[in-house]
């Protein structure tokens, strides 16, 4: 099986496990980007603890689920967003989140992978990666 987008595969695995009311999900292959996205989701309270399992090949990540994710996915194409756009929430950005104060957008910024709330607090823009609510 060829995996073209490992981040999309990881988020789909998490969402499928949440819909089946599982307590944990196993994500493979692991990558630094996936781990950083999971850290943001953990800081925002969408997932519990996660651990990296080195299997000698690609590695796996075991994620504890809390049952708080309704929908998650990647944003394709990954386009850049300025700070001004994040603060105003234009109409094209609203299609990823159901309401103004519900959910998070995950961005790759010069300060690392952050949620859109953290990016606004640090006054930086970035490239949109994913959404979670």
Swiss-Prot record:
Gene Ontology biological-process entries: translation
Highest taxon of the lineage: Archaea
Keyword Ribonucleoprotein appears in the UniProt entry: yes
Any Gene Ontology CC annotation: ribosome
Listed GO MF terms: rRNA binding; structural constituent of ribosome
Function: One of the primary rRNA binding proteins, it binds directly to 16S rRNA central domain where it helps coordinate assembly of the platform of the 30S subunit.
HAMAP family: Ribosomal_uS8_A (MF_01302_A)
Subunit structure, as described in the record: Part of the 30S ribosomal subunit.
Name of this protein: Small ribosomal subunit protein uS8
The organism of origin for this protein: Staphylothermus marinus (strain ATCC 43588 / DSM 3639 / JCM 9404 / F1)
């Amino acid at each position: 099986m060829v995996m073209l987008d490992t981040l999309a595969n990881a988020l789909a695995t998490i969402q499928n496990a949440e819909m089946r009311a599982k307590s944990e999900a196993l994500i493979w292959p692991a990558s630094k980007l996936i781990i950083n996205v999971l850290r943001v989701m953990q800081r925002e309270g969408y997932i519990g603890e996660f651990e990296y399992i080195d299997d000698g090949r690609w590695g796996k990540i075991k994620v504890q689920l809390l049952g708080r994710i309704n929908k998650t996915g990647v944003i394709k194409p990954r386009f850049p967003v300025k700070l001004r756009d994040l603060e105003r929430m234009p109409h094209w950005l609203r299609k990823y989140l159901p309401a103004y104060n519900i959910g998070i957008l995950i961005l790759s910024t010069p300060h690392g992978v952050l949620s859109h709330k953290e990016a606004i607090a640090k006054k930086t823009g970035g490239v949109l990666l994913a959404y979670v609510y």
